[in-house]
Structures are given as C-alpha cells and as structure tokens.
C-alpha cells in the first residue's frame, strides 16, 4: 500500500541553510534505509547564502567564496541565492511510491509553482531549454533537485519580496543576463505567509498527501 503521509515543517523564523540541509539528509537516509516510510516537506526562508550544485561553474560566483556563506551541495543546477523574502520548499519524497521518473517530477514541481503564482493573478510559464518558472524573459522561481535511490532532496524557491540585488553577485542559474523578479513586482500586496499556505495546498492537490507535524 502506498503511503501518502508526509511530515511537514513550516518555521516562521529564518532558518540557517546548512541546518535544514542536514535535516533533509536525515529524512532521505531514513526513507532509503526503510527506517521511515513518510515523506518530508519543508517550507520556509533562509539567511542570505549562495548554493552551488554538482558540476557548477565556479566562475558564476562573482565574489570570493569566503565573503559570503557558500554551500556546495548534491543537487543539479548552477549557483543560486537564498535570502529572507524568498520562499524555499524542500521535498524529500520516495518516488518509488509515486512515479520513478525524474522528468515527471520536475514537470510536477513546475506545475505547483505555476498554479501558486496564478493564484495571485501572476501569469507565468516554463521556458524551453531551461528549468524554473518565468515571466517572459524574467525568472521568478528556481528548481534544483537531487535524487538517490529514487528518494528526492532539495526542491524549489519562489522570489516573493526579497532583495533582488543579492543576485547581482552571481550569474543566476548559470544564465548570463538572467533577470530575476519578485511576486511583489506584479502583486504589491503579496504576503509570504499566504504564499506558503497556497504552496502547501497545491502540493496536497498534486501529490494527494496527508500532512502531519512531527
């Protein structure tokens, strides 16, 4: 029988990136080893930091790595930036119980983001040849995942009302000339707590999960 139960954490405070990364790894290891059969979802915000995916071009970091918090992690994709005002969602899911297809999973994440933004009357779409979600030529949401023995890690981020100038220190997602935007550029009254509620609701709709607090 497929377990559709997911532990969910939604901290209100800013969370240190590496602490949450270690937490994801613990849940991933528990699913792989069979110690747990529950998925894990985390929604929140990080302190200002930069993360670098597997095989990233370090030239896309436009500063010395000792000037800011930089984390090299086990996800696909290039360098990106996290900060307050950006909603980050991590999904540690056992795809063996859903669909053992990473392309399907990436399209599912894009769908969750697009449905979320459209709930706030923000028209957006995917872009051929690129991951993430875009408004024209501007990028509003980034995706980066890892997967080990069909158990996923990492997830996606949506710029809600963050300080976009922090992206000037990198080549976002390795795309030269990429311009990042906020939800607040299109909906001035957007609130990150409301965005979090909508993301949770749509994840429930798309995966048919039952959420429990640990």
UniProtKB/Swiss-Prot annotation:
Keyword Acyltransferase: yes
Enzymatic reactions: octanoyl-[ACP] + L-lysyl-[protein] = N(6)-octanoyl-L-lysyl-[protein] + holo-[ACP] + H(+)
Residues that, per the record, bind substrate: 75-82, 142-144, 155-157
PROSITE patterns (alphabetical): BPL_LPL_CATALYTIC (PS51733), LIPB (PS01313)
GO molecular function terms listed in the Swiss-Prot or TrEMBL record: lipoyl(octanoyl) transferase activity
Root EC class: transferase
Catalytic machinery residues: 173 (acyl-thioester intermediate)
Pathway in which the depicted protein is active: Protein modification; protein lipoylation via endogenous pathway; protein N(6)-(lipoyl)lysine from octanoyl-[acyl-carrier-protein]: step 1/2
Predominant location category: cytoplasm
Keyword Hydrolase: no
InterPro entries, sorted: aa-tRNA-synth_II/BPL/LPL (IPR045864), BPL_LPL_catalytic (IPR004143), Octanoyltransferase (IPR000544), Octanoyltransferase_CS (IPR020605)
Function: Catalyzes the transfer of endogenously produced octanoic acid from octanoyl-acyl-carrier-protein onto the lipoyl domains of lipoate-dependent enzymes. Lipoyl-ACP can also act as a substrate although octanoyl-ACP is likely to be the physiological substrate.
The family this protein is said to belong to: Belongs to the LipB family.
Protein name: Octanoyltransferase
Originating organism: Prochlorococcus marinus subsp. pastoris (strain CCMP1986 / NIES-2087 / MED4)
Gene: lipB
């Amino acid at each position: 029988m497929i377990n559709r139960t997911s532990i969910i954490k939604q901290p209100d405070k800013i969370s240190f990136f590496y602490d949450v990364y270690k937490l994801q790894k613990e849940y991933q290891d528990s699913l792989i080893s069979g110690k747990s059969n529950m998925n894990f979802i985390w929604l929140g915000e990080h302190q200002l930091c930069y993360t670098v995916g597997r095989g990233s071009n370090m030239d896309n970091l436009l500063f010395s790595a000792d000037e800011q918090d930089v984390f090299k992690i086990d996800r696909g994709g290039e360098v990106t930036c996290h900060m307050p005002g950006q909603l980050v969602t991590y999904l540690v899911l056992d795809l063996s119980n859903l669909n053992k297809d990473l392309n399907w999973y990436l399209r599912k994440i894009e769908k969750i983001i697009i449905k979320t933004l459209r709930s706030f009357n923000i028209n957006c779409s995917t872009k051929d040849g690129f991951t993430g979600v875009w408004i024209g030529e501007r990028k509003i949401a980034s995706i980066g995942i890892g997967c080990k023995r069909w158990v996923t890690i990492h997830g996606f981020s949506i710029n809600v009302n963050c300080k976009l100038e922090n992206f000037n220190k990198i080549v976002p997602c390795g795309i030269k000339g990429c311009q990042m935007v906020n939800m607040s550029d299109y909906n001035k009254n957007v609130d990150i707590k409301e965005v979090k509620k909508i993301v949770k609701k749509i994840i429930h709709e798309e995966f048919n999960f039952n959420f429990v607090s640990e």
